[in-house]
Structure formats: structure tokens, C-alpha cells
Amino acid sequence: MIAQPAKTIDRKLTGEYSWEWTKNELYMKTEEINFVENKILTTNFHTHTTRCNHAVGEDRQYVEAAIKGGLKVLGFSDHSPYFFSGDYYSTFRMKREQVPGYVDSILALKKEYKDDIEIKLGFETEYYPKYFDKLLEFYSQYPIDYIIMGQHFVLNEEEHIYSGDLHHEEDMMMRYVDQVIEGLETGCFTYLAHPDLLNFGGSKENYEKAADELCAYAAKNKVPLEINMLGMREHRHYPNFEFFKIAARHNCDIILGCDAHEPKDVCDLESAKTALEWCRELGLNRIEYPELKKPCRK
């Protein structure tokens, strides 16, 4: 049986959550709660839900964990549905018919926990120019606060060129950057998630040239770049320290994103400490609350 969290939290209580992973479900026992004194990570706009098929935990559990961890603002940004042609089916994003339930759930939690935390409704999505206008039309039905760009594929997803695979083609990094910049030009995206996702095995010169172009654009247009803490805690090829050296030269705005797929990661203080060490070492301009942009054309 899953213990249901109380609707209001008594901040006088002390103790901790206990987490158990059983039969592909995340069980949370809300017993006594120990609120963390957290001054290094007060916002997180990169949070997923089970609707994307690779996250665990109930929406409420993410909110409870965020409050416990000391967050002041929690943004939900699950993987957006997309409108592909033909019979192509994307397995890592919510279905369009799940969106009303997602919206209703987040808005209900926003109202319920308004005295404890600020909750924002968003999506993480790619820029696929062939289908993007149809996606914006779909978004217009809902009170979405923001979307973030996570460019998981180059070109369109049906071509299966996953950005995180190792690419040795010398033009691949620039192809990725060109598509990202074209997407950012729409003015729809609040920030760029894991900007260094493209796993480039070509020449250092071509990597730096493309990264420099992306960072120059981001700096000029005040688009924050995310240090992705999922990549950090899972020891992936990103975040890439060399990429953020280039971002520092352009004085880019930097935001920390937990990229939480489990409630326990919604306030990842250990990774945040490492990310802040990067910011201090490189002189990066870290921001906590970006300007939220509604997903519509300029």
C-alpha cells in the first residue's frame, strides 16, 4: 500500500523520507519529514513524470521531495508529445492524449501546495522544423508557463540520429548547432537543456568552432545554458567541462537543471555543489530563475 502524503506539511516534524523500488513502482512513505536548509539550489525547472515511460514516482512525490529539499520553485517539464507523420512512434515522450491529465495534475498540485512552493507547468521538447508549428498550435490549448529545448535528435527524429551517440562525422557538431540556433530563433524556448549533449568524436577544432558559435548566440540573445545534473550524477559524456570553458568566454547565463526522473533527484544538492564549483572556477554567470517564455511564435 502506498502511503499518501498529507495535504499540508507540518514543518515542525523531523525525520526523513524512505524510498523503496519494487515492481517498477516507486513507493514513498511519508513519515516524519526533515526539511533541508538549502541555499545553493532553490529552483529546478527540469523535472519529468512517469508519462515519458522512463521516469518513476507520482507527481505529488516530486513536489513533496522538492519541498523537503528546500526548493522554492519546481518546474515540471516532461517530454512533450510530437506530431510525426506516418506511423512513426516515439517511445520516450508522453502521448498527446496524456497531456490533459498532466496539465490537470500539475495545476491541482500548484493550487494545493501554493503556500509551500511555487510550481510551474512546462515541457521539454526538441525543435523539429517540419512539425514545430503544429506543436505550438497544440500547446495553445493549455496554460503552459514555459518550454525548454532538449535537442535529442539531429534533423527529425525519424532519421534516428540520436545526439548522444558518438558521432565522428566532422560536420555533425555544426549540424546540431545550426538546428539548435534555428529553434532558439523562434523565441519559444526559455532555456537550452544539456547544450553539450552532442557526443562529438571528430576534431577538437570543429567541436570548438561549433560550440563557440552556439555560445556566442546564447550570450547575445540571453538564452541560458543548462549544466545538466543527470549527466553529472550518472557520469555521462555531458556536462562537458570544455564546452563550459567556451560558454564562460562568452559570459553566457548558466542554469542548473536536475533533469529529475525520480523524486529523490528533484533537488540534487551533491551534483549542484559540483556544478557550482565549475561556475566559480570558470567564472560562469549562474542564474536561478530565468525569464519564462510562453511557447508561441515571435
Region locations from a protein language model:
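Mid-to-C-terminal alpha-helical segments outside catalytic/metal-binding sites
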Residues: 12, 18-31, 269-298
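Domain-core and long-helix interface of multi-subunit machines
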Residues: 53, 148-250, 266
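Well-ordered, non-membrane alpha-helical segments in soluble/globular domains
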Residues: 99-106, 173-177, 272
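Short, hinge-like loop/turn segments at secondary-structure boundaries
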Residues: 92-94, 165-166, 243-245, 272-275
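Non-catalytic positions within long, well-ordered alpha-helices that form the structural scaffold/packing
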Residues: 67, 140, 184-185, 248, ...
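An N-terminally biased module of ancient metal coordination in phosphate/nucleic-acid-related enzymes
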Residues: 3, 10-129, 133, 139, ...
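Active-site core of metal-dependent hydrolases
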Residues: 224-233, 257, 261-262, 272, ...
